[in-house]
């Protein structure tokens, strides 16, 4: 099924960032009932977001702190609506709920109990400390900035007279408006014992729905059903990996075949032209002048064939498309390898990967966090053994094999260049021999002096087009890294150590693919 511009073929996440006032209501009135009414307004606002932005085949993920007041309401709304939530905190949770500001403790005992329950709720898929500053204001500001950077849409729930603070919800609202991030400003008011919100959207025209790169237009549709919850990482990644692997194989074959044809046709054209020059005139005087056109016609046909393949490679962007889909395939293999390991996938966002892939990576990260949130440490040894056998050992065998193959072809191309270049030099030097010695050299040897340099350059062109030098070194160094990592995995003593080693390994493996992508995308045959 072809891709609709507004409907991604796999479910993609839309992050809804949140910030709000700690105290939403005046002291008077039935606080619990008023908060319930505000919570209802927030539920309606969140449920309206997909329709507001015409989202199809997308799922929401909340991103917020877990302070008292508005943050607590947002967490409850996400919990009731079964929206996964990532919680970013300015400090470790125990310190956070016991912190004190200028007006005393941030949390009362009942608020602390409620926050603790929400923090351990099944809908919370990540608990992350977003700041290491010793300054309280800086901690809250840095956390809000992290929420802002992670969000596609922002919701700010503010009391009617909320004042601006660089580290508060009004500051978040102001920053979102300046950065052209769509933001819903919800101002709370109480009239005759009824709490309502005045909702004002800003920057809606700047919303960009997450989409798949155009290379995946023909990916079969995988619909998302909110009632089924988020898919398993394997279930989510498999369609992408299979499609990308199939496309990568097709592009790879086309690129290598076209590269060989382009180079060989130009070498062959040179050989034909040289033969034509050497035999020129042999047909004259025999009434067969039309034979003079045979070699030019053959040469022209070969050159046009090579040129045609060259233009096709550039017109279809074969090299870049191949690199792109292979990068997707390797990313999904990487994520599948750590699917049982309790860790975030931050390395996907640290590596220099194409920005078009950000929606996919963010969605994969949410799916992975949801699947590993429980983190059963008692089974970490089983996870380690599986990772060793299915990832480390498999990749080690792969890189060893590819290193030997790349090195063999690199040496072959290098030998051809040296041999034919040396032969060309010797042929040229033969011109400096005496007349008597030159008479014994067949006249066709001069033609080899034209052909051999072209063959030498052709060998180097094949080596460059296949990226043999860089691939050989990459395969060797990566295999060496995996050999060093393996004993560390065997000696690991906990899930934390396993997670650290796995993330280090995956960042290195995917980093090598990212480096290859950068070279391959802009490295053609000619």
Which stretches of residues belong to each language-model region?
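Acidic/glycine-enriched connector segments
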Residues: 2-197
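Conserved non-transmembrane functional hotspots
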Residues: 201-526
């Amino acid at each position: 099924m072809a891709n609709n511009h507004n409907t991604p073929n796999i479910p993609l996440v839309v992050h809804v960032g949140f910030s709000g006032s700690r105290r939403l209501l005046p002291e008077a009135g039935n606080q619990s009932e008023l908060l319930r009414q505000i919570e209802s307004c927030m539920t309606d606002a969140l449920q309206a977001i997909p329709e507001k932005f015409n989202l199809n085949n997308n799922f929401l993920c909340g991103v917020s702190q877990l302070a008292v007041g508005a943050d607590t309401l947002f967490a409850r709304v996400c919990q009731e609506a079964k929206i996964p939530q990532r919680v970013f905190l300015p400090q470790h949770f125990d310190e956070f709920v016991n912190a004190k500001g200028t007006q005393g403790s941030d949390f009362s005992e009942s608020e602390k109990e409620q926050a603790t329950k929400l923090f351990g709720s099944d809908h919370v898929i990540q608990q992350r400390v977003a700041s290491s500053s010793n300054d309280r204001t800086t901690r809250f500001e840095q956390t809000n900035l992290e929420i802002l950077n992670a969000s596609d849409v922002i919701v700010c729930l503010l009391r009617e007279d909320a004042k601006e603070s660089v580290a508060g919800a009004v500051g978040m609202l102001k920053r979102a408006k300046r950065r052209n991030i769509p933001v819903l400003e919800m101002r709370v008011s109480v009239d005759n014992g009824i709490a309502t919100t005045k909702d004002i959207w800003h920057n809606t025209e700047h919303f960009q729905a997450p989409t798949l790169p155009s290379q995946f237009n023909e990916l079969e549709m995988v619909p998302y059903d909110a009632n089924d919850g988020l898919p398993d990482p394997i279930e989510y990644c498999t369609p992408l990996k299979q499609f990308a692997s199939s496309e990568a194989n097709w592009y790879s074959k086309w690129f290598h075949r076209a590269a060989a044809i382009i180079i060989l046709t130009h070498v062959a054209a040179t050989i034909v032209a040289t033969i034509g020059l050497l035999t020129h005139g042999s047909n004259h005087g025999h009434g067969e002048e039309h034979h003079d056109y045979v070699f030019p016609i053959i040469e022209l046909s070969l050159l046009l064939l090579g040129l045609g393949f060259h233009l096709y490679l550039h017109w279809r962007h074969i090299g870049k498309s191949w690199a792109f889909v292979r990068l997707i395939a390797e990313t999904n293999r990487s994520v599948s390898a750590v699917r049982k390991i309790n860790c975030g996938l931050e390395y996907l966002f640290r590596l220099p990967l194409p920005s078009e892939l950000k929606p996919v990576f963010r969605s994969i990260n949410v799916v992975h966090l949801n699947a590993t949130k429980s983190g059963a440490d008692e089974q970490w040894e089983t996870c380690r053994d599986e990772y060793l056998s299915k990832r480390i050992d498999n990749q080690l065998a792969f890189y060893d094999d590819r290193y030997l193959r790349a090195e063999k072809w690199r040496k072959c191309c290098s030998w051809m260049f040296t041999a034919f270049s040396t032969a060309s030099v010797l042929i040229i030097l033969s011109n400096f021999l005496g007349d008597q010695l030159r008479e014994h050299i067949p006249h066709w040897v001069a033609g080899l002096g034209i052909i051999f340099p072209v063959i030498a350059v052709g060998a180097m062109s094949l080596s460059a087009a296949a990226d043999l030098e860089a691939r050989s070194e990459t395969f060797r160094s990566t295999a060496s890294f995996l050999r060093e990592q393996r004993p560390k995995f065997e000696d690991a003593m906990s899930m934390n150590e396993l997670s650290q080693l796995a993330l280090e390994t995956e960042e290195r493996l995917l980093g090598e693919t990212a480096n290859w992508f950068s070279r391959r995308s802009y490295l053609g045959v000619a």
